[in-house]
Amino acid sequence: MRNIQILFIIGFMFAQTTVEGIPKSYIHSTSNRVMKAIMPDIDVDQLLLEDKNAAPGTPFRYGKIFDVDYSLNNSGTWEVLDDGDKIWRLEIHSKYAYSIGIEYDYFHLPEGAEFYVYNPDQTIIHGAYSHLNNQQDNNFHQTAMFID
């Protein structure tokens, strides 16, 4: 029981603040043409073999990390809505991945901005994240989203 309580407390300490809302792309007519970022293929069997052969005491691997450089200026699709608001969207695909988690090394939202991460069929929504999620070091870690 003690382990469960400790994990619960740690999880609570690092919980992400979200505000009520839904993505504007859900309620406005938007284009289906969105830039797709394709991650390199993952060889799950190879990763499992590496984990099996890892030296004792090696930390548990929770995923394969790919360094990328996507930003509002060099990727994604900008769209102006009928009401004048602007939205930016980027699809991220990773073949054979069980889930996708995203770590941002520069994350800053101005007041009034909302940020969402959602799956293709729009049944899972993470967010809205807002300026309340800005950190002193500008880092932000997106909770893993499990995919089919």
Where do the language-model regions lie?
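Bacterial Sec-dependent N-terminal signal peptides
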Residues: 1-21
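Domain-level representation of secreted and single-pass membrane ectodomains enriched
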Residues: 16-148
